[in-house]
Each structure stands twice: as C-alpha cells, then as structure tokens.
Amino acid sequence: NIYLINRHDGYGFRLIIENTSNEDAYNINLTFKLKNNQPFPIQQKVYKETFPIKIMDGKDRKEISTIIAADSDHSFNATWNWRNEKGRNFSRENIVNF
C-alpha cells in the first residue's frame, strides 16, 4: 500500500508518502494536481506554501526527499504513479487536506 499522511512533529508540517508493501518502488514518478486540476512538477516552488515529502521504501527504508507545493485552500488532489523493479505499474489518487 502507498499512503500519504500529514504529520507535525515540531519541525513543521510534513507530507509523507510511504510504501508499506513488499513491492519495490525505486522508480517513482510523482505528479500532483491542484484542486483546479492544474498539474505542477514536484520541483516547482512558486506557490506560497511548500512541504517536504519523504518517500520511504517498504523493504530497506531508503528515503527520497523532495518538495511539493499546495494551494491556498489547504487542500489539493494528489496523483502519483510508480513502477516497481518487476515492471508493474501502480497509480493512486488522493485528496490531501492539511
């Protein structure tokens, strides 16, 4: 399973995507869309609020950190697609509130 959580631990808000399955997910391509369906790459930092995202592999807990941005309504549609080492494609959509 892949899930996204909003966590506050004293260092600021963090949106964390974690792979808890036994499937390897080393090749992860994330695409996020705002509520108005405007897509933006994870490298884009033109929005007012940005949050770090941590991607953790379910097996060896390797982490990949990046930054995404959210809209002013504190809610956005998140869509991410990834492919594991066996070539299987996965996709998940979620509305994220923070």
Each model region followed by its residue ranges:
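Amphipathic alpha-helical "stem/stalk" segments
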Residues: 1-98
